[in-house]
């Protein structure tokens, strides 16, 4: 299923959006119902639709366009569940809070960091670790290359203030990426 054309995950993100809309339409009697509580809609959305939308995304070398495609689809679904049109001028963040749903950007980032932690703690002889450092033979084309998965992870780690060494301690790593934003000082007391 994960067939990337020349290192791009564009077709994969399009497929995920299409599958998520299919699942959303399947669940629309509940998700679009006026009588159902927003909290219930949010829980059903997270389990049935958002999980389909971001399936496997922790392994994608995600470009900005791919992320925007996922975010755009999710925002449309969130507005539909809340019964709010764009003309109402309600902030999407407020709608996320009322549903109890985290944005797809944060979920993808956390899942990618969680996967990185698993890979980083693996034995260096494991095939997963070996795949990270494969050198492809051939001539490199001119210009900047495509964004790699490692670059995506590096961005995520910079935004959370993390280092590669932090991934070795599973408890600290899990608490850092779970939403409990630990500062460097509070991490020091754990070690």
What are these regions (language model features)?
Residues 1-191:
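Short linear motifs embedded in intrinsically disordered, charge-biased segments
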């Amino acid at each position: 299923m994960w067939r990337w054309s020349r290192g791009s995950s564009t077709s994969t993100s399009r497929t995920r959006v299409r599958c998520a809309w299919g699942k959303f339409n399947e669940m629309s009697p509940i998700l679009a119902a006026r009588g159902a509580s927003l909290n219930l809609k949010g829980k059903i959305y997270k389990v049935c639709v958002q999980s389909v939308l971001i399936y496997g995304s922790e392994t994608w070398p995600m470009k900005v366009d791919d992320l925007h495609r996922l975010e755009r689809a999710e925002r449309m679904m969130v507005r539909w569940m809340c019964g709010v049109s764009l003309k109402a001028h309600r902030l999407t963040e407020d709608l996320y809070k009322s549903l109890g749903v985290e944005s797809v950007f944060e979920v993808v980032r956390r899942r990618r960091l969680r996967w990185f932690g698993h890979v980083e703690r693996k034995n260096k002889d494991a095939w997963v670790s070996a795949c990270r450092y494969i050198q492809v033979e051939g001539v490199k084309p001119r210009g900047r290359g495509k964004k790699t998965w490692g670059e995506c992870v590096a961005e995520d780690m910079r935004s959370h203030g993390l280092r590669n060494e932090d991934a070795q301690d599973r408890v600290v790593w899990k608490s850092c990426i779970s939403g409990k934003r630990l500062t460097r000082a509070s991490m020091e007391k754990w070690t």
